[in-house]
């Protein structure tokens, strides 16, 4: 039977799921309808649509995982449920993280200005760079799945023991193996985090350089390019903030699971972990002019619909 803490956890998890689904379904529908209408798909729309689809899948896995953890946590002691759910969660998390990183890099190449020949060469081949990064992420996903298989096997061996403390005192080998595998999984998450941080830093340097050039030429500090820099920086910075919360929550959740198992503390740490797939869609909507304008029109129509007087009953 679910306790009060379980009910609170499930309520918060459901709220995160609804928020995330609203934003990502909106992004997917708008971009798909625009692509069908224009018979052309731009790179940014393709990345946004793939990110929305990946996040929707991630949110569905998260909801199922939260229901199992809150209502039937004993199922995770068996390999039949735990292995496929954990694999699907990590795959969806990996794809969502890398697609968000590719989007940050895309905005960096699209908006930043550097006279360096290497930057110009990469910018000219921006679509190829994004394709290479996505291909690299697929190879890393295979490596991640192999490491995760070993991680699940080792953790299930520990869960099968009736006394975890006695077992760890008798032999440190399983715990050491889990720690090593956890480090490998963390390094795999660190790569997109570093790329996103690097994109933000270079965007900031480009903004500083562009603003200084405008002041030297007596054109002021506000023009279309400067505003584009600032909008991109706000969006990437917001994504990076959620990314930081997501990254560190992932590390804390995994280490807490290794030490304490699947208990109440681990449950509520995962709520912070799920903030990234739940909230980043609204940052993307605010940062994209087409999505933002469509959202404003939709809210305006909803507002007018709610204000419409109800017809009198006959």
From Swiss-Prot:
Gene3D superfamilies: Rhodopsin 7-helix transmembrane proteins
Topological region Cytoplasmic: 29-50, 123-127, 209-238, 287-314
Residues in compartment: Extracellular: 1-7, 72-101, 149-187, 260-265
Record keywords, A-Z: G-protein coupled receptor, Glycoprotein, Membrane, Receptor, Sensory transduction, Taste, Transducer, Transmembrane, Transmembrane helix
Subcellular location: Membrane
GO molecular function, a single term: bitter taste receptor activity
Note in the entry: Most taste cells may be activated by a limited number of bitter compounds; individual taste cells can discriminate among bitter stimuli.
Name of the protein described by the UniProt record: Taste receptor type 2 member 42
Source species of the chain: Macaca mulatta
Lineage, uppermost ranks: Eukaryota, Metazoa, Chordata, Craniata, Vertebrata
Gene that this sequence comes from: TAS2R42
